[in-house]
A protein has these predicted regions:
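Canonical Radical SAM [4Fe-4S] cluster-binding loop centered on the CxxxCxxC motif
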Residues: 27-64
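Short linear Ser/Thr-Pro motifs
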Residues: 3, 37-38, 51, 119, ...
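A C-terminal junction/extension of Radical SAM enzymes
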Residues: 2-9, 235-244
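Conserved alpha-helical substructure of the radical SAM core
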Residues: 53-82
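N-terminal [4Fe-4S]-dependent radical SAM core
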Residues: 1-36, 68-72, 76-77
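Short, flexible active-site-adjacent loop segments at beta-strand->alpha-helix junctions, enriched
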Residues: 17, 27-29, 40, 89, ...
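Conserved AdoMet/S-adenosylmethionine-binding subsite of the radical SAM
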Residues: 73-82, 87-241
Length: 244
C-alpha cells in the first residue's frame, strides 16, 4: 500500500506459520526509515492502540525482523538508513530476540546502531538491562500521559511500573549510555491535550536531556479516542516551558 502524498509504503508480510505483521517504509530528506514489528499481536493493552485488540500470538524471531528490512529494500529499491522498532508488539517484551536482531543488523549490514530506535511502553526492568548493554541505540518511550492516574487509565502497564519508576529508569539509561531519551506523546482530544497536562509534563521532565515527539493519536475503528486539534498549541506550551 503506497501513499500518494509522501511515498510511504506499508507492507503486510506473511510468516511461515501463516501469521502476518505490518512494516512501514518512510522516505525523508535525510534518507529512508523503516518501522518494523517485533511481535505478532501485543500483550500491553494500551487502549488507543490497534495492535493489542486481537491479543498476543507470539514473539518474532530475529530472522523475521531482518526479513522485514531485506524484503522492503528489495521491493522498493531503496537503501534503508534508519530502523525503528515501533510496529506491532512491545519490543522489550521480546528483548532476547530483539537484542539478537540488533547484533545481527550491526554485524551483517554494518549499520550503526546509533541509527536504530527501540520503542517501549515502559518495561522498567528491561530498560535497565538494555542500558547496561550499551548498544548505542535511541530509546523511545511511549509516555502519552504525565500523571499516574491518567496514564493508568489508558496504559495498563502503568499499574505495574509507575511513572516515577519509569523516569528513574530513563535517567539511568541516559547516564549509562549518553543517549537522550525520546518521549512519544500521542495527543488525544479531551484527554491529554490541555494546559494542565502540559504543565504536568513540563514538571515531570524538568532537568532531563530529552526530546518530546508530539503526534495526534491514530484513530482506530475499535476505539473511542479522537485526534486532538491542539497539537501546535500544546507544542508551543512545551517550548515556552523549555522542552523541545
Amino acid at each position: 500500500l503506497v501513499s500518494d502524498i509522501d511515498n510511504t509504503v506499508k507492507y503486510l508480510y506473511g510468516l511461515s506459520d501463516g501469521e502476518k505483521v505490518e512494516t512501514v517504509l518512510m522516505e525523508y530528506k535525510h534518507g529512508n526509515s523503516i518501522c518494523i514489528s517485533t511481535q505478532v499481536g501485543c500483550k500491553m493493552g494500551c487502549k488507543f492502540c490497534a495492535s493489542t485488540k486481537a491479543g498476543f500470538v507470539r514473539n518474532l524471531e530475529p530472522s523475521e525482523m531482518l526479513l522485514q528490512i531485506y524484503e522492503s529494500e528489495r521491493d522498493s529499491g531503496r537503501k534503508i538508513n534508519h530502523v525503528v522498532l515501533m510496529g506491532i508488539g512491545e519490543p522489550l517484551d521480546n528483548s532476547d530476540n530483539v537484542v539478537k536482531f540488533l547484533r545481527l543488523l550491526s554485524a551483517k549490514d554494518d549499520m550503526s546502531l546509533r541509527h536504530v530506535s527501540v520503542s517501549t511502553c515502559g518495561l522498567v526492568n528491561r530498560i535497565y538491562e538494555l542500558a547496561d548493554l550499551k548498544l548505542g541505540i535511541t530509546l523511545s518511550v511511549s509516555l502519552h500521559a504525565p500523571t499516574n492516574e491518567l496514564r493508568s487509565s489508558i496504559m495498563p502497564i502503568n499499574d505495574r511500573f509507575r511513572i516515577e519508576e519509569l523516569m528513574e529508569a530513563c535517567k539511568y539509561y541516559f547516564n549509562t549510555t549518553g543517549r537522550r531519551i525520546s518521549y512519544e506523546f500521542a495527543l488525544i482530544d479531551g484527554v491529554n491535550d490541555n494546559r494542565q497536562s502540559a504543565d504536568a509534563l513540563l514538571k515531570l521532565l524538568k532537568g532531563q536531556n530529552c526530546h518530546v515527539n508530539l503526534i495526534p493519536v491514530n484513530e482506530i475503528k475499535e476505539g473511542v479516542f479522537k485526534r486532538s486539534a491542539s497539537v501546535e498549541k500544546y507544542k508551543q506550551m512545551l517550548i515556552d516551558g523549555g522542552l523541545n
